[in-house]
Amino acid sequence: MYDEALAVDRIRAARAAVDAGGEPFVLVGRTDVLLVGGGLDECVRRANAYLAAGADCAFVPGAADAATIGTPVRELDGPLNVVMGLTGNTRTLDDLRELGVRRVTVGGSIARAMYHHLLRAAREMAERGTFSYADDQLSPTELNHLFRRA
């Protein structure tokens, strides 16, 4: 984890670059304090420093229960971003809205879920010689409809 002053300087520089570019962009101030065993006080202090330096929202990986989400929501000077889609997440979007979360990140969880399905299909073909994995797929019509909308 970066020294706090260095992290603030980096966010300040990123904000200047974003503003100079003129394109819509969300600058996220991420603090990994909870992931490295730090407490909520340090987490909130760092996140508020990042917001003051120009971050549009504060991203706090590791905030998952009502306390670790609710405290930053109440004490931050800007919106909170949390990560969901990890193993064991039981909160819903409605739960997160009620707690005051303004942005949700899913990271690579959707891709990892797809890789899991791919690996299951490959193992089924290699080990059993069957193709039942294909029973759970989008039809060509559904795919074409999705691509037309995109």
Q: What is each stretch, according to the model?
A:
Residues 16, 108-150:
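Extended, intrinsically disordered, low-complexity segments
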Residues 1-82, 86-106, 113-115:
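Alpha/beta enzyme core
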